[in-house]
Amino acid sequence: MDRLGFFKHGLSAATDVIGSVIGLKKAVNTFTEAVDEALSNIKSDIGLNLQSLQGDMCENPRNTLSEAARMGYTMIETASYSNGRIYDMKPDDFREAARKAGLKIAGAHLTKLLEDMPDATAESETDSAAAGEATTAEDPVTGWWRVALDIHRDLGCRYITMSRLPESLSDETTARYAEYFDTIGDMAAQRGMKFCFHPDKSHLTAVNGVSAFDAIAAATDPAKVWFEIDTYETAEAGIDTKALLRRYGKRVLLLHAHDYGVVGESGRIDFDPIIAEAVKRGAKDIFVEVRNYMLPPKNCVERSIYNLESLPSIRF
């Protein structure tokens, strides 16, 4: 082989090697890009209680829902219902806005105290008219909840939660609300939903040795009434959250990851073992709730999901 032939042969071999390396690099880059894309599509199933962005939801609900989805939230719990409307939107319009944003409407917080019921007949008729239904004479409790539950069932809700009780709670009042919750729970079950009670600090604080929450839990039917436990409220009440979760087990369907500011940044609530215990005991969904803002609400909500997703207890 002459020198020119040797050079050509060597150049050809080198070209083959370079081509192999470049091909390998392209393959590696393609694989890396595919992995990055796959990972970007994996989301932890963390929900957002929309009370956290209530001001934004009232101003621009569609944009706010899209922002929540961009942050990584996959489902929402609504916190605004009046006269048959959700955040002042027709239910079908709200459902479509959530669908376009890529969010499931998992649950809703609804409130109707027994003390409010003298006005409930008129309001249930207003809600029925807003929903396009004929109005008929009906027990005010049944009427208001019938319309509200029908609307939220059609939104796709799995859970209906109530978090309020009268400020002054006697034993008799507590017993009345236990019966009331059983009634709501039965109506929700007939529509394929579950009713949850969300106790706050005052409900969790023992008076004469027993808390309103424990009294209601003991008096309600476990097949009709479940619970949503809020980490901020248990902390404020001085309750051991993990012990509470162990005590009520599978009746705790929902957990509010709620801190003294951005979730996971106060140093006052250890979320990882609480979430692990909740999941172990059968909790179905976790919702971020932010009510104390050190930053603009959207920033707080975004940092909260980022912090939660870094916890070992959050599964993807």
Give the label of every model feature segment.
Residues 1-17:
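N-terminal secretory signal peptides and thylakoid transit peptides that target proteins
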Residues 15, 19-22, 28, 32:
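Residue-level detector of alpha-helical secondary structure
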Residues 30-158, 250, 306-316:
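N-terminal pre-domain/capping segments
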Residues 33-47, 58-72, 156, 208-229, ...:
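Histidine-acidic metal/acid-base catalytic patches
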Residues 47-51, 77-79, 106-111, 161-163, ...:
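A cross-family glycoside hydrolase active-site/sugar-binding cleft signature
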Residues 53-59, 79-90, 112-119, 136-142, ...:
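Acidic-and-aromatic substrate-binding clefts and catalytic sites of carbohydrate-active enzymes
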Residues 75, 100, 104, 113-227, ...:
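Active-site acidic/histidine proton-transfer and metal-coordination neighborhood
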Residues 90-100, 180-188, 244-247, 273-278:
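Catalytic-core regions built around general acid/base machinery
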